[in-house]
Amino acid sequence: MLKSQFQQKKMTRNYTGAWQKTPGRLLGIFLIRFYQITLSSLIGNQCRHAPTCSEYIYEAIARHGLWAGAWMGLFRIMRCGPFGTDGFDPVPPSLGHSCCFYKPWRYWKISDKHNK
């Protein structure tokens, strides 16, 4: 029998799809994982969304890079407050043509369009 038949996939709460391992993405992923392992375990799950904010930022950075992912994550955290949104809020698979690095406020609009 093949060894691969008996291997189980490692279960993780973070994005498991393929992503380019650039220095910026690796730095962002490292910081998010550091938060998840240290502070998040002490604080507990306080997020009102699924996936949680740290999982969302992890996936946003992995899919869209450090700059776009960090802005999307910041706007997600701003939406997660007591008077913000809740429920299922996934990372959009693509950003669209209106998003560019010198207009970071447009990353807020991506999440709004994706949720509707």
From Swiss-Prot:
Gene Ontology terms: cellular component: plasma membrane
Domain of life assignment: Bacteria
Cysteines paired by S-S bonds: none
Compartment(s) where it occurs, according to its Swiss-Prot or TrEMBL record: Cell inner membrane
Pfam families cross-referenced by the UniProt entry: YidD
Entry membrane topology: Peripheral membrane protein
Keywords, sorted A to Z: Cell inner membrane, Cell membrane, Membrane
Job description of the protein: Could be involved in insertion of integral membrane proteins into the membrane.
Protein family: Belongs to the UPF0161 family.
Designated name of the protein: Putative membrane protein insertion efficiency factor
Species in which this protein is naturally found: Bartonella tribocorum (strain CIP 105476 / IBS 506)
